[in-house]
Amino acid sequence: MKRILTFVLALSMALSLAACGGKADDNKGKTEVTMTAQEIMDTLKEKLGDSFGCDVAETEDNISGYWGLDMGQVESWASMSNSNSAVNSSYAVIVKVKDGYAQDAAALLQTGYEQILSYSRMYNMDLQKVLQARLFVNGNYAVLLILGAQGDWEASDEVQAKFAAEEAAKVDEAWRGIFGSADNGITIPEEDVSNNGGFFDMTDDEGKNDPVLGG
């Protein structure tokens, strides 16, 4: 009788452990986060160190103006860039929004990103880092991250691209440490070589290649 009871107890414990293991697997990559946007920004800054790259806090006007976000839908936000933005494109925008607005916020971040990318392509400025941008949507958080240490601008495109990818992997790791997953939703539009991304029309009315502002 004792043997039977011992066997039953052992079997019950084994089944319980298996069930717990199943729950752990189901929740893998689905970490519940309640941090504010600023707390997430501070965590990224701490984790990334020199690979963070941002040193200037942006204003709310920038969030609602340049990025076009509806502040009535935003519960908390944080945004930083680099003080030498002419040559360093590091940027981080984090918003925690109300239910149902995360995808809309992500679409606006994508639009703003495309303008940054056009500028980088035009001047070949920090381009490889910009091409490694991250757009994350986790629950009610929407985030655009263009982060990474500065590479060697005199290196070949291949070397710069490799370095930027390695830096972006650090961003993924830091984000995964907070949310459990790092699924990048950024879309990289094809380069429009006909008009330099829409900033300038490089031909005048006679078809010459003299720069003309505005288009």
Regions flagged by a language model, labelled:
Residues 2-10:
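Sec-dependent signal peptide recognition
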Residues 21-91, 97-215:
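Soluble, non-membrane globular domain cores that form compact, hydrophobic packing
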